[in-house]
């Protein structure tokens, strides 16, 4: 049956065949007047009318279902003939608006077979009127459903709906049909594994690697035995430091930034200088400070003033230091322009294509010649070099872009144009490598690294060994339709074998969550089984049982219980449990460190190694580092451009070209080039569907073999971690950052932790300068609170400067209560819940070598408060402090013996000497703090003024800290005659002073020691005066003036 709505009237009525046919009206109350058209043949109107009556009777039986009981009539007007063909009668008519609704006179048609059954090809169109009831053919059509021959339960439902559709409200009918449609979609996508529908899913679009090298066969082996990469090392490297001096046009120039980032990525030390200024110091005693000089703009070198040019050239000749220069783009196009003082000519502002390398160049080491980078090169501002002297040799060639510059004649052969040039130094004794374009072209990045190696005589050479490990996270985790099938597992094994031929020892590393085993479709469950049947083919590591984030657990027992479930699953399915490696879902709990995770890992899995992309931050990738915490080595993890949702090549963000760009010289390629040890994160979904991970890693490894001399290999995680920390021992200690400063970190940090409780300012010492008195005065303020006292170090936490730092951030934060807690020791009333200024006082922070870096990482916005007194007086006070506490060395050696102890003295004596003398090098330590904190966050207190006039000192400190309300210390501090210093006034007649150990009177320092210390600190005190003047906000203390006047 077909019922459809139209919007036109048939005015070609043949009135002589018009009849009225009464039929019981359908329940929904619509009256239909039909107009018959499309006449084939019909001569007897009465016979046709009878046929119509019979058909409508059958129609009402089918769709009225006994409910068409109203007295209204269906009026059918026969105009022209009734079409009858193949047992089907078709009526096309228009509504006359009879019934309860307001008909709009739309054309309608009804098709029935003579048996009263719907035709095998069924479509239903429904029109609605404007009244509360709905009518057949009473307005614009609003919906429909089409289908083919009924099959199974779905078609049965459709027939049932069709038969009852005219016995209920049409709007409900539409909703029912939509519901059936949604149910059918859900059924087919979640429960049907085979058949026509499943075949519609694109599963045969697996991209194949297209990287082909002329020098490498299909098995990843070089066709001819390639000569080993040249060794640039020579004895000249012994006279220079492994550091690069980079001259830039401005501190914000783009190429200068690219150069600096490339050096950072490869951990090459460098110094940036703005060209045009005076040269920095180039030598240190008899050694050159820099191994290579780099000019972002070659013109800055060529046009350097005579004095600086001669100094620089003399340094380069004397220490065999080379120069790298880049031809800077300019608006003026040069043709055959000669470089100043050199028999060298340049053409600029060219568009080029098809770059290749000179296989005879002695510069190349990391980079392999023999291939061509086909296609247009980036940019339209290339410079090419022309020369006629034997000192010059091309390193890189390119062709003119014929699309931009057509050849003069058809078939003309273009000569290669030199885009990177080596100057052997035959003219002036200085070797150079000149680039005709920036680092936008990926090949220039490799050649630039080779130039640094060559010009520094191997001092800046990179190791050519690269380790690659590919983790496959989320095994058994994934929605239906995204998981692995048996064919995917076979492809995984086959690809692993192919990669292993190019990367010795390579095996995929699979991380599993056992809870979701057999949670796919039937075929995907077979894939799970097939994966476990081949468990021996891979390396394995544990995720969490249900892929939970560990930082959400505050109970160690529960966290361990979840791990035990995954462990039991591994045992039941013969998965190895001794890898010593684990990955936390979403890297939760690794960094920021969740201490319970590290504890549970050790107890359940005996984890020795993990990895994360979050330390210290996800971006920029060049700054990712490793660390060791609780004897678990944490390695930096790399991304490869594939994530859980990137499963199909045609849906890859940016398209296939974007992925290929990353592989062929882009981000993924450069990640492996720059990192000696690479652990890549992928997911199970990347190995199903289009198997993008297999395509990606096969392609990038082949591309690496085409263009580099890198030696690729793989090893288990524990072995990689040991190698990593041998290469980078400076990364063993972690640096705890503030989780609230990184949105990603905050998401994987416990919700029970709050950065607001961290201290807003630090009192850093040094020791024996009055820090305890300052601590006491600050605690009197109602809006200021300090940490909870430590059972070991009392009011000092001593977190940033000792072994406490390795206990982790959680341990440190436990010392700081909620900032809303009242300060019960304060005489100043405070309201519960008012803002609090938390602070920490640890006098050992001042001269701690690692303290400024560590504190700035966690508390970058904190204010820093320090107290300075005469360094000689401070040294003597520390010695007497140790004597009073029964220190054996202090009681057995005089002060003079201690401060004059040699480096060959007993270790304990040297330690005491250092603790007496080193903190007094004030300028040196302050400069260290100012390397991390701006001067605006540093407040220096004159220790003598704190002792003699604490009220003014405390008022000034409150203004610096911007604390409200201000506390009037004149009402709370009183000079105590017996103690000889100010104390807290608790009543009119009683003071609360520090203990007996504070303010102790010592014997006067002997004159010999005093003179020695005045000479010892002379240069340090002079530097302090210069620093204070530079800061400009502090007057020169009187004790400093006295020390300098006496010393002279």
Curated annotation (Swiss-Prot):
Glycans are attached at residues 388, 555, 823, 892. InterPro entries: Heparan_SO4_deacetylase_dom (IPR021930), HSNSD_N (IPR056793), NST/OST (IPR037359), P-loop_NTPase (IPR027417), Sulfotransferase_dom (IPR000863). 3'-phosphoadenylyl sulfate binds at residues 768-772, 877, 998-1002. Its EC number is 2.8.2.8, 3.-.-.-, 2.8.2.-. It catalyses: alpha-D-glucosaminyl-[heparan sulfate](n) + 3'-phosphoadenylyl sulfate = N-sulfo-alpha-D-glucosaminyl-[heparan sulfate](n) + adenosine 3',5'-bisphosphate + 2 H(+). Pathway: Glycan metabolism; heparan sulfate biosynthesis; Glycan metabolism; heparin biosynthesis. The active site is at 768 (for sulfotransferase activity). Disulfide bonds join 983-993. Keywords: Disulfide bond, Glycoprotein, Golgi apparatus, Hydrolase, Membrane, Multifunctional enzyme, Signal-anchor, Transferase, Transmembrane, Transmembrane helix, Wnt signaling pathway. Its main location: Golgi. One of its GO terms (molecular function) is heparan sulfate N-sulfotransferase activity. Residues 1-172 are cytoplasmic. One of its GO terms (biological process) is regulation of imaginal disc growth. Residues 193-1048 are lumenal. Residues 192-752 are annotated as: Heparan sulfate N-deacetylase. Pfam families: HSNSD-CE, HSNSD_N, Sulfotransfer_1. It is a single-pass type II membrane protein. The keyword Transmembrane helix applies. Belongs to the sulfotransferase 1 family. NDST subfamily. This is Bifunctional heparan sulfate N-deacetylase/N-sulfotransferase. The gene is sfl.
